[in-house]
Amino acid sequence: MKKLTLYVFLFLAFFNMALTQSSLPECKGNDIKNPLKKFLKTKKWTNCHGTFLDLKGVTVYSGEFYKGDSHGYGTFTYAGRKYVGQWKNGKQHGQGTYTYVNGDKYVGEWKKGKYYGKGIYTYANGDKYVGDWKKTKYNKPDNQRERNGYGIYTYVNGDRYVGEWKKGLRHGKGTFTHANGKIEEGIWKKNKLVKSKQ
């Protein structure tokens, strides 16, 4: 039941997000060709839709603004990375998709610039995690991105773990099904099965 609820929630959330378009007016003085001039003007942008390019021409945000901050719905790109989704007070907040340079992708809930809540993380190598996240910074190395709560991790080799996670590791009740059919079920601690279900 947990698994079905998780999939239904994620589908509805991202279907609604995909339909989001700004109804706000264009920000006054929007000129992507003049980043310095634009930077000065963004401080005054509020309740409008515009594009901001940083002084180095590397970071681009196109979307809704409120009191000079990205706020509402917008797209952020930086050195090959891209975030599309909701913002609040200059940080990713709500539903959003973050694509990494290496091809990894996170689609899910955000809170104050971090993965927080339900989300799907697809790795460039084909692995996939669907489940809960807690206070995870998007710019941390993979081994520090914290899967927390209940989730399903499917490995590209056919292995699969369904169960509880803590700080990115299998921790709590869970079932690990190997590609060869072997099943390990019981209580896990820091990725190790410590109590097998008989």
Summary of predicted features, one role per range:
Residues 16-198:
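Glycine/tyrosine- and acidic-biased, solvent-exposed loop/turn segments at the edges of beta-strands
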Residues 4-14:
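Sec-dependent N-terminal signal peptides
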